[in-house]
UniProtKB/Swiss-Prot annotation:
<feature type="active site">
    <location>
        <position position="213"/>
    </location>
</feature>
<feature type="region of interest" description="Disordered">
    <location>
        <begin position="114"/>
        <end position="136"/>
    </location>
</feature>
<dbReference type="GO" id="GO:0006508">
    <property type="term" value="P:proteolysis"/>
</dbReference>
<keyword id="KW-0645">Protease</keyword>
<keyword id="KW-0378">Hydrolase</keyword>
<comment type="similarity">
    <text>Belongs to the peptidase C58 family.</text>
</comment>
<feature type="region of interest" description="Disordered">
    <location>
        <begin position="1"/>
        <end position="81"/>
    </location>
</feature>
<feature type="active site">
    <location>
        <position position="228"/>
    </location>
</feature>
<feature type="active site">
    <location>
        <position position="100"/>
    </location>
</feature>
<feature type="compositionally biased region" description="Low complexity">
    <location>
        <begin position="65"/>
        <end position="81"/>
    </location>
</feature>
<comment type="function">
    <text>Potential cysteine protease, which may play a central role after invasion of host cell.</text>
</comment>
<feature type="compositionally biased region" description="Polar residues">
    <location>
        <begin position="7"/>
        <end position="29"/>
    </location>
</feature>
<protein>
    <recommendedName>
        <fullName>Putative cysteine protease YopT-like blr2140</fullName>
        <ecNumber>3.4.22.-</ecNumber>
    </recommendedName>
</protein>
<dbReference type="Pfam" id="PF03543">
    <property type="entry name" value="Peptidase_C58"/>
</dbReference>
<keyword id="KW-0788">Thiol protease</keyword>
<dbReference type="InterPro" id="IPR038765">
    <property type="entry name" value="Papain-like_cys_pep_sf"/>
</dbReference>
<dbReference type="InterPro" id="IPR006473">
    <property type="entry name" value="Peptidase_C58_Yopt"/>
</dbReference>
Length: 271
């Protein structure tokens, strides 16, 4: 079992990721709307395969990482730095081989540690990073076996993912909730769930181009931290507009410079 997130900081196969300016109004309204759909499996999601690593951005090196004790309180202004204004812990080159499911599992296992310790543990060359790679390989093998037996891509993905999460000592909920990114509905239902104090969620990001990527969130003591294996940790207040703003900035980053358009998010609670 994992613990509540430590420190002061406040599924799917995988592809490339992304930035663009975001308005400073109510993001809960302008994000309009991750229309919730229950994961009925009637519509198959893309298979999670490939390399979910971000394309390098020459400006990334100049982006300041925020203090872990000071989550962002204002909307990002610069297209190049909008996402990184939220960053409270940096992680580089950990996901170049597309092992985001394994890295996310290991991140959950290390929640009781400080942000810097969590990122150090996931650095390439570490034992934890090697373990993440092994979990990813197991996930892929299980998924391939299930597909060969006739399972649909979504069913195979969820079952394989749950298996490796459980073997990592985690307790994933059996089902996922599906949200269509950009459709008119109520984004608050998703961000309120993510922001619930003491909750941990695995989020699968699906892109219109067919790729997918796995990230995670943990909410504790009035702040919510989002972990993206490509970039590190991002932290905001556990406020609907703040969380919606962070998600929009993440979507912007995957669109530019990576050319990936976020279309669907699934959420799975870690019990």
């Amino acid at each position: 079992m994992y613990d509540r997130i430590g420190g002061s900081s406040t599924r799917t196969s995988q592809t490339d990721e992304p930035s663009q300016s975001v308005d400073s109004g109510s993001f809960t309204e302008t994000l309009a709307d991750l229309a919730p759909q229950w994961s009925s499996r009637s519509g198959e999601l893309p298979d999670k395969m490939g390399a979910c690593c971000s394309k390098p951005d020459t400006l990334d090196a100049n982006v300041q990482t925020s203090s872990a004790s000071e989550p962002s309180t204002s909307s990002p202004e610069s297209p190049a730095t909008s996402l990184f204004e939220y960053r409270t812990a940096d992680l580089r080159d950990a996901n170049v081989d597309g092992i985001c499911v394994g890295l996310t599992a290991e991140w959950f296992r290390n929640l009781s540690n400080s942000p810097s310790t969590r990122m150090s543990a996931l650095t390439p060359g570490s034992q934890t990073h090697a373990s993440a790679a092994e979990r990813q390989q197991q996930y892929q093998r299980l998924k391939d076996q299930l597909r060969s037996r006739g399972a649909g891509s979504s069913q195979a993905d969820l079952q394989a993912q749950n298996t490796i999460l459980e073997e990592a000592g985690l307790e994933p909920a059996g089902e996922e909730k599906r949200f269509a990114f950009g459709k008119s509905s109520n984004v608050k239902s998703m961000v309120n769930e993510i922001n619930e104090d003491g909750s941990n969620h695995l989020l699968s990001l699906y892109f219109a181009e067919g790729g997918a990527h796995t990230v995670a969130t943990s909410a504790s003591n009035g702040t919510t931290t989002l972990f993206d294996p490509n970039y590190g940790e991002f932290t905001v207040r556990s406020d609907p507009d703040q969380m919606a703003s962070l998600l929009q900035s993440l979507a912007n980053r995957y669109r530019n410079p990576n050319g990936q358009h976020l279309s669907t998010i699934t959420t799975q609670r870690m019990q």
